[in-house]
């Protein structure tokens, strides 16, 4: 039998060759399958691609979510809907401009559906699901594509958006001016409850003559001119506001019987003011009530400001038709307090109280939280006015209050000088008389007859009159802004000796900032029967 020749090749090598061919075939099949899958993936509707989201996010979402965060989240349907809705709104305006009303109507309809879905999601506190978002996003995508296909290009969109933004800015500016005017009107108005209280107190004064004798005794008290006591002055026609100032001051004083309050009001409020302070206890402090009409020496022949207040042109400027640019841009120019002599009495303190040497001036919209008697021992270094400076903000520099384009101002004052605040000031009346500050005040009022140096208020002439005569105090003595600034640090308020509700949002008004109102209410005698009757009336 013939024998086959021996094959010296290894069997292992033949097996290796078979495996190589098997692996090559497997990779070829896998590549073909991957190609088919990728091809199918790219064939999908673009709107479906926009809707892809990780469903696991929905499964772990809490039942009540922060909808603001949901709208701003890059992975939420809410944000996608909001972005498409914004773009659709732009195309609504463009479609209307091109008289394509049908497309504008379709877009508006989808926008309303989108807004409804977003509001429902916000109300229920749960994210929008895929099934809810899909029909709206698909419809909006189709309409946006239709708008783009109508050749509403980017340039057209930008021009339309620009004009729309300008129109919105004009409306916003008009609304801001209107809000300022309305806020000013509310701030100027006397609340019904305060008017009611004034009437009741005036009636008491008229029907009870015994109070007149007590008032005369108070006015002749030797404590009123005793320089060993602590003297405070308040000029106001607001009974409740003045009461809170006095009550908060005596409540925080270590020795309230050593305090003397000098209150000046007008003829209208004089009787009510007397009746209130005679019928309430202020811990033994001395209180003097006077009327500004008593100061016969304060007349037009002596005081330029009195002459201006009586001037018909000045009254027309404040109360006439709003035809000037000043009254349009500055609605507070028309505030009647700028025509009230009470507002200007602070410049005549040494003449009103000729026997006093030092006094603390308090506005009627402040609340005292600490003992103020240490103010009287402060060293003012020969200055007249101790006040808290307000130049931490740039807009409280001199150039913001005064017209530095006028050489009379620019040649004498530093535009970057720090402003300061009225509201809580300690005055050295001896230094005042020596520097003749009131004469300075008269000079600047004369120079401002045409209102070319400043427009309104008592602070600008105060900055001029006390220039170089003001001693800066620690800011904790006087914290301002509670009548307009909602973001004052609580720690600053709590450590303040005096908090000041300067601004339109006074604490006795309904538009007061609620966060700050309790500080004022704490010192209001709300248990008084007249207050209870008038609040519920």
Swiss-Prot record:
Superkingdom of this protein's organism: Eukaryota
Tissue specificity annotation: Expressed in roots, inflorescences, siliques, seeds, leaves and stems.
Alphabetical GO biological process terms: cell wall pectin metabolic process; guard cell morphogenesis; mucilage biosynthetic process; mucilage extrusion from seed coat; mucilage pectin biosynthetic process; rhamnogalacturonan I biosynthetic process
Pathway assigned to this chain's UniProt record: Glycan metabolism; pectin biosynthesis
Membrane side Lumenal: residue ranges: 38-537
One Pfam family of this chain: Glyco_transf_8
Reactions catalysed, as given in the entry: [(1->4)-alpha-D-galacturonosyl](n) + UDP-alpha-D-galacturonate = [(1->4)-alpha-D-galacturonosyl](n+1) + UDP + H(+)
Listed EC numbers: 2.4.1.43
Compartments where located: Golgi apparatus membrane
Segments on the Cytoplasmic side according to the record's topology features: 1-16
Membrane topology: Single-pass type II membrane protein
SUPFAM superfamilies: Nucleotide-diphospho-sugar transferases
GO MF, any single term: polygalacturonate 4-alpha-galacturonosyltransferase activity
Disruption phenotype: Strong reduction of seed mucilage accumulation, associated with reduced absolute levels of rhamnose (Rha), galacturonic acid (GalA) and xylose (Xyl) but increased absolute abundance of minor sugars (e.g. galactose (Gal), glucose (Glc) and mannose (Man)). The double mutant muci70-1 gaut11-3 is completely defective in seed mucilage production and exhibits a strong release of minor sugars in total mucilage extracts.
Segments passing through the bilayer: 17-37
PANTHER family the UniProt entry points to: GALACTURONOSYLTRANSFERASE 4-RELATED, HEXOSYLTRANSFERASE GAUT11
Subunit-structure text: Monomer.
Protein family membership: Belongs to the glycosyltransferase 8 family.
Physiological role: Glycosyltransferase involved in pectin and/or xylans biosynthesis in cell walls. Required for the biosynthesis of pectin in seed coat epidermal (SCE) cells. Collaboratively with MUCI70, essential for the accumulation of seed mucilage, a gelatinous wall rich in unbranched rhamnogalacturonan I (RG I), and for shaping the surface morphology of seeds. Catalyzes homogalacturonan (HG) elongation by acting as an HG alpha-1,4 galacturonic acid transferase.
Name of the molecule in the record: Hexosyltransferase GAUT11
């Amino acid at each position: 039998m013939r024998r086959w020749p021996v094959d010296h090749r290894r069997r292992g090598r033949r097996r290796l060759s078979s495996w190589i061919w098997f692996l090559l075939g497997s990779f070829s099949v896998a590549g073909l399958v991957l190609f088919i899958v990728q091809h199918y993936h790219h064939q999908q509707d673009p709107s479906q691609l926009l809707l892809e989201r990780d469903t696991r996010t929905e499964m772990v979402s809490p039942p009540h979510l922060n909808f603001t965060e949901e709208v701003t989240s890059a992975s939420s349907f809410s944000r996608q809907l909001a972005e498409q809705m914004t773009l659709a709104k732009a195309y609504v305006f463009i479609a209307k401009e091109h008289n394509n009303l049908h497309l504008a109507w379709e877009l508006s309809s989808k926008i309303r559906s989108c807004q409804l879905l977003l509001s429902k999601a916000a109300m229920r506190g749960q994210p929008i699901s895929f099934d809810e978002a899909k029909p709206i996003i698909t419809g909006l995508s189709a309409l946006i594509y239709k708008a783009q296909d109508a050749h509403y290009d980017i340039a057209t969109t930008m021009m339309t958006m620009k004009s729309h933004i300008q129109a919105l800015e004009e409306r916003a500016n008009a609304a801001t001016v209107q809000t300022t005017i309305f806020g000013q009107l509310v701030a100027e108005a006397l609340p019904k409850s305060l008017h009611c209280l004034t009437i009741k107190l005036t009636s008491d004064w008229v029907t009870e003559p015994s109070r007149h004798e007590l008032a005369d005794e108070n006015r002749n008290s030797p404590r009123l001119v005793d320089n060993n006591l602590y003297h405070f002055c308040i000029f106001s026609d607001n009974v409740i506001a003045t009461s809170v100032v006095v009550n908060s001051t005596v409540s925080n004083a270590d020795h309230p019987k050593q305090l003397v309050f000098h209150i000046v009001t007008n003829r209208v409020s004089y009787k009510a003011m007397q009746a209130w302070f005679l019928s309430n206890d202020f811990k033994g402090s001395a209180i003097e009530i006077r009327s500004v009409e008593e100061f016969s020496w304060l007349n037009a022949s002596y005081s330029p400001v009195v002459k201006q207040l009586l001037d018909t042109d000045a009254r027309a400027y404040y109360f006439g038709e709003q035809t000037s640019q000043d009254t349009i841009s500055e609605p507070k120019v028309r505030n009647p307090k700028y025509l009230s002599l009470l507002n200007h009495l602070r410049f005549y303190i040494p003449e009103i109280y000729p026997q006093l040497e030092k006094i603390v001036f308090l506005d009627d919209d402040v609340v005292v939280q600490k003992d103020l008697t240490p103010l009287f021992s402060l060293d003012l270094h020969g200055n007249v006015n101790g006040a808290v400076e307000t130049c931490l903000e740039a807009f409280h520099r001199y150039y913001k209050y005064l017209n530095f384009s006028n050489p009379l101002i620019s040649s004498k004052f530093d535009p970057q000088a720090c402003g300061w605040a009225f509201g809580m000031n300690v005055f050295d009346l001896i230094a005042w008389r020596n520097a003749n500050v009131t004469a300075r005040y008269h000079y600047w009022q004369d120079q401002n007859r045409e209102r070319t140096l400043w427009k309104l208020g008592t602070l600008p002439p105060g900055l001029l009159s006390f220039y170089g005569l003001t001693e800066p105090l620690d800011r904790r003595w006087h914290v301002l802004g509670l009548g307009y600034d909602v973001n004052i640090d609580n720690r600053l308020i709590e450590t303040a000796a005096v908090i000041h509700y300067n601004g339109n949002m006074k604490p006795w008004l309904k538009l007061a900032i609620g966060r700050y109102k309790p500080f004022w209410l704490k010192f209001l005698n709300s248990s008084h029967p007249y207050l209870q009757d008038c609040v519920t009336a």
